[in-house]
């Protein structure tokens, strides 16, 4: 069965001060976090990769990773496509002065024409570990419609400051009922807290790793039209169409059911510039422990 890895990379270069964080090597061989995600997705069974980028970064993106990945993928019978997120690709007029991208919902819609199979969607600059890819792949190939990898909160915190996480509420069958966005979660001696309130570090959180089907894209497209009519007029410069928010609305309305698949892997991201060294050390340890080979793709 064909399945797609959809990588949201259109935000590249926009959130990191010096240098482009998504293209920062994390090991001595020059691999970036995206290499590891692609490796883990192919290892799990995904056989189509779609990069969502901006047209203005296409050249640099292909030089740093795209062309290299394309040749690795072709050696493993994995196809590669590009989709371009464009601020003008909207069901209405662009508000005067708007420069902010429209968010993850619009990013995924940009790939609508190249997604014909069940797919997993991830952030380009996050490391998710192998388990989530395997769990989502198994769920999708066995006929599941919508799922989300649930990470254990304590495995997603930063030593360098507070983070925002979507804490998941579920019913007794492990179906998502609500994602509660919780800001400024910091590590403490006993666990974690957000603005002085203790947070359960064993809660499951959403890190934007969703398993979905092409049918969802039609729903997402209709939602974008509605968002444009209802949200944009009152907040033309800042309104964003975000996947977790939209899915949360569908859950509330009983129009969607999402299975939460727990993963025990540690999530790594570069929220703060200081996180870079810690992330590199984590990869060094995984390589030393044999989780990955130095010649990354040689074990596929």
What kind of feature is each model-predicted range?
Residues 1-28, 44:
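Glycine-rich N-terminal loop/short-helix segment of MobA-like nucleotidyltransferase
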Residues 204, 258-265:
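Catalytic beta-strand/loop signature of glycosyltransferases that borders the donor
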Residues 221-256:
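A C-terminal functional module that forms or caps the active site or interfaces directly
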